[in-house]
Amino acid sequence: MKAFRLDELEAERAANDGAYLQFLRERNMSVGLYALDAGTTDSQKPHAQDEVYFVVSGRAAITVGMETTQVARGSVVYVPAGVAHKFHHISEDLRVLVVFSPPES
């Protein structure tokens, strides 16, 4: 078993000065913590993997392809591989668990 605490993951991510911390990588999936502060820009490009976002905290909008929705704590969003997507109108610091399948390269 592997178990993680969000507060420890956030501290590690912040200490490494990055918006993204991959903390689990297995044969069929990887998981990371993505952080975007209020007012910042999400510069993601489409990925070759399917993704699931689980919003841990914060508020924003996300556009996936041509669809836009508001997200906040507890929101779950699926993004198919190869589809353009980004968070925007980030009104509260956003922390998101990201699951990639297959694992992100």
From Swiss-Prot:
InterPro entries to which the protein is assigned, alphabetical: Cupin_2, PKS_Associated_Protein, RmlC-like_jellyroll, RmlC_Cupin_sf
Gene3D superfamilies associated with the record: Jelly Rolls (2.60.120.10)
All residue ranges annotated as the Cupin type-2 domain in the record: 33-100
Protein name: Uncharacterized protein SCO3923
UniProt organism field: Streptomyces coelicolor (strain ATCC BAA-471 / A3(2) / M145)
